[in-house]
């Protein structure tokens, strides 16, 4: 059996058509976060909890964690999952003696936002942040204690029972130290989608505050798309970016067509110029009869208008071979529509992906 050649970062392949906002200080029982409510956000959310995805550079521990989680990836997770995480963290905060505000992955849970993929921050204990390095050296049975010298009262919100939580912008920025750029991008988009912050607030924080891993935050901001409607859509878009496939619009409303009730027909990702649409199908797309029929009708209508609609499932994002096959499929469709080969790279480091996107925006 012949040995496989070593793949180098950034190696190009050619695919042609013949190849396949602030937290309120009072508890609103009907609002978000048991008192971490934001006034201008809708009172519902149904998104998937994020799970780690296998990528180059993973350690053995990362791979084992991924394999343990694989069976759960195919289960549809509703808003209840976020509420359960929040309730567990909330109760732990009540019972613990904490030297500082809740931060990092614990604050993500308190904000009722999906956790990012591939983060080194674990949830077996609470995470808190202090400004005094002497406090960070004290062993705590209840929490991991982090030190951030830039912490002050502007960054802390309080619940009615006196629990301090880092605001959304500080939470996102401090997560950068233990999170890859793709996970940081996904976390930022989730916070924006749930109304916890805005892209401009995140950018202002990065530009005006002092903390570690600013370059990683700038890269994540470059890759961010506030129109993304779910974590899986973000993962799908970033997968294509990593293989050098650009030009996709998130949550694209197709002009000239709508459902019978007048609702716009949207695509998770779309290349409007070439009429290529990509739809992420979670388990509810096949288990819900109404949803399945609605999806089938939508795709028939789009195909009659010349669109090519590609369905994506968790399997397509589950590991690098499946991600590569998905990217090659999209590249082949583009090549067929353009009538010429399409250059496809092997997975690029996120720094290079962000740099390329910045260059394209300047053109």
Residue ranges and their predicted role:
Residues 192-363:
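Surface segments flanking catalytic/ligand-binding clefts of nucleic-acid enzymes
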Residues 1-210, 335-363:
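Short gly/ser-rich loop at a beta-strand->alpha-helix junction or flexible surface loop bordering the NTP-binding
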């Amino acid at each position: 059996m012949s040995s496989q050649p070593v793949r180098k970062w950034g190696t190009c392949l050619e695919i042609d058509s013949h190849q396949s906002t602030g937290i309120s200080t009072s508890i609103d029982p009907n609002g978000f976060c048991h008192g971490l409510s934001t006034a201008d956000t809708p009172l519902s959310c149904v998104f998937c909890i994020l799970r780690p995805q296998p990528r180059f550079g993973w350690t053995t521990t990362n791979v084992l964690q991924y394999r343990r989680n694989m069976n759960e990836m195919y289960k549809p997770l509703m808003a209840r999952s976020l509420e359960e995480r929040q309730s567990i963290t909330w109760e732990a905060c009540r019972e613990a003696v904490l030297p500082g505000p809740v931060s990092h992955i614990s604050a993500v849970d308190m904000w009722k936002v999906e956790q990012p993929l591939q983060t080194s921050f674990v949830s077996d204990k609470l995470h808190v942040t202090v400004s005094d390095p002497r406090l960070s050296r004290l062993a705590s049975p209840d929490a991991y204690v982090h030190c951030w010298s830039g912490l002050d009262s502007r960054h802390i919100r309080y619940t009615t029972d006196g629990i301090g939580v880092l605001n959304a912008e500080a939470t996102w920025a401090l997560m950068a130290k233990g999170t890859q750029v793709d996970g940081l991008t996904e976390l930022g988009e989730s916070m924006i989608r749930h109304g916890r912050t805005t892209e401009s607030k995140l950018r202002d924080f990065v530009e005006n505050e002092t903390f570690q891993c600013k370059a990683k935050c700038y890269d994540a901001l470059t890759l961010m798309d506030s129109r993304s409607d779910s974590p899986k859509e973000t993962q799908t878009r970033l997968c294509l970016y990593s293989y050098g496939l650009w030009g996709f619009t998130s949550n694209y409303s197709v002009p000239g067509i709508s459902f019978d009730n007048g609702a716009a027909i949207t695509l998770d990702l779309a290349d409007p110029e070439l009429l290529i649409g990509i739809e992420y199908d979670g388990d509810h797309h096949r288990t819900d009869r109404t949803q399945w029929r609605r999806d089938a009708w939508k795709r028939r209508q789009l195909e009659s208008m010349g669109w090519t609609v590609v369905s994506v499932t968790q399997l397509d994002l589950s590991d690098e071979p499946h991600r590569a096959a998905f990217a090659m499929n999209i590249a082949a469709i583009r090549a067929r529509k353009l009538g010429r080969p399409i250059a496809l790279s092997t997975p690029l480091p996120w720094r290079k992906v962000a740099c390329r996107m910045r260059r394209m925006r300047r053109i």
